[in-house]
Amino acid sequence: MAFQDFDKIQERVNAERKRKFRKRIILGVVSVLVVAAAIIGGAFAYVTYENKTQEQGKTTNNKSKDSPTKSESPSPKPPSSAAQTVKAGQVDKIIQTLCNSTLYKPTCQNTLKNETKKDTPQTDPRSLLKSAIVAVNDDLDQVFKRVLSLKTENKDDKDAIAQCKLLVDEAKEELGTSMKRINDSEVNNFAKIVPDLDSWLSAVMSYQETCVDGFEEGKLKTEIRKNFNSSQVLTSNSLAMIKSLDGYLSSVPKVKTRLLLEARSSAKETDHITSWLSNKERRMLKAVDVKALKPNATVAKDGSGNFTTINAALKAMPAKYQGRYTIYIKHGIYDESVIIDKKKPNVTMVGDGSQKTIVTGNKSHAKKIRTFLTATFVAQGEGFMAQSMGFRNTAGPEGHQAVAIRVQSDRSVFLNCRFEGYQDTLYAYTHRQYYRSCVIIGTVDFIFGDAAAIFQNCDIFIRKGLPGQKNTVTAQGRVDKFQTTGFVIHNCTVAPNEDLKPVKAQFKSYLGRPWKPHSRTVVMESTIEDVIDPVGWLRWQETDFAIDTLSYAEYKNDGPSGATAARVKWPGFRVLNKEEAMKFTVGPFLQGEWIQAIGSPVKLGLYDA
């Protein structure tokens, strides 16, 4: 069956209906209370704010911890809240507040002060965040000019520089998108765009790191790393400022409409995300009914469809297509390199089964191809979905780094898919990703990257690699503590593949190792078979790298290797309590209501809740 393992949705329909009915009743009561609270709270906030403003006018400003004074400023339109405008003299205090949470305070303060001197006095605290993002953008221009000035005749280095240019362009594009989103937002609703800003700026950090990683170890790479240091510092500061600005705006009295806006915001966000999905398309996500499926294009190797290759179907997709574009891919092995670029958002690919419709390739690092470019399949366009498909890299263990799929599509979903490879099978590169009821197979670091990705109800199989090789399920690559990225393995099974079972004693296997300084991985409510060593986690190349700064955690795992008593004693490892584990569930970690809204099965919280 094409959809043989989809969590028995029908068994949960009645329970889901009851839950939704209860939710409607609760929301109805809450709405009445919110309206009442809005009227009372709005009046109270206004009076309190007026009194507070008068009191602040009588006090001195010699304490940095004092709240900034607010006043009316000339504006083309009335401010939407008391937080909209600030006196020019208060800008320095706000800068200090926003920069206090950063890792590089002097740089943050100098950046914002220099940027504010270039323009009219800042009348909106959000302008300071935009100034920080502009600084990253400008610095990237200068950084890449310096990179281009470096002399090299080595072909690999020249290729790495070319790749770096593409990555810098992607970073600048997402910086531009971030600034536009800030411009288009209302102050009262700034909190609603925070997850997007976090995702985009986290990706900007990843792109810069990938640029450096593209060079072989040596003098040139050291020079490249040095050049990117300034832009990475500025990116880190921008990420830190998002949270502190959100906190600052939330602490300032708002007009009474805020309560009403918040009461309606969840529904509006959901409508915005799913406006391009019809009811029929949502139903399609729950079960593949080939007869009822009416795709925009059909791919079939035997010629029974519109196209015989996936790339041909993508090439025929209309430019700037509005809505979701569905491609049905009939059973067969498709030996082609596929890239769904950023100009193709909202693409859905549906196969006949994860072991029937397979995209395959064999590019590898052993063939002198950089890891980033070895992927058989690349998903970049926002909102990509794949269902009942397989993705392979057949380079084998001798190929070393050989990626089956690289995913950087924001809000991407993979349902009942299969990912097969050895080292570096699944490159969960950037942005928010959700994998449900998938099979992932590999040896070394076979789930790696710097996305915010949750793997739920998946089977993770460790296979036999090269003699003496140690297996690691994950190698998460968070560079900076303010990135909102990390891997969560939730309600999954980690077990030996069939080829490893007879010889598993000869191959030590671990849940993960730290690829980058702030690597973050959580394994919770999962079954861990005895293939995993009791210590659980592996050092990076037998060093102490990142053991103080990483964030590895477990919660209520079972199975022969689920116990944590013998786990590593690193400062960065811990066993979570229930409240802590909740932070890494789909709801808060991926803002996962968008997954539920499109009709995909998903558990937003813990299974033991």
From Swiss-Prot:
CDD domains: PMEI-like_3
Stretches that traverse the bilayer: 25-45
Renumbered residue ranges of the record's region Disordered: 54-87
This protein's GO CC annotations: membrane
GO molecular function: enzyme inhibitor activity; pectinesterase activity
Glycosylation sites: 51, 62, 100, 114, 183, 229, 296, 306, 346, 362, 491
Residue sites binding substrate per the record: 371, 401, 513, 515
Pathway terms, separated by semicolons: Glycan metabolism; pectin degradation; 2-dehydro-3-deoxy-D-gluconate from pectin: step 1/5
Chief localization: membrane
Topology in the lipid bilayer: Single-pass membrane protein
Subcellular location: Membrane
Keywords of the record: Aspartyl esterase, Disulfide bond, Glycoprotein, Hydrolase, Membrane, Transmembrane, Transmembrane helix
Catalysed reactions, as listed in the record: [(1->4)-alpha-D-galacturonosyl methyl ester](n) + n H2O = [(1->4)-alpha-D-galacturonosyl](n) + n methanol + n H(+)
Enzyme category, top tier: hydrolase
Documented EC number(s): 3.1.1.11
SMART domains: PMEI (SM00856)
Stated role: Acts in the modification of cell walls via demethylesterification of cell wall pectin.
Stored NCBIfam families: PME_inhib
Additional detail: The PMEI region may act as an autoinhibitory domain and prevent untimely PME activity during transport.
Name by which UniProt lists this protein: Putative pectinesterase/pectinesterase inhibitor 45
Species, as recorded: Arabidopsis thaliana (Mouse-ear cress)
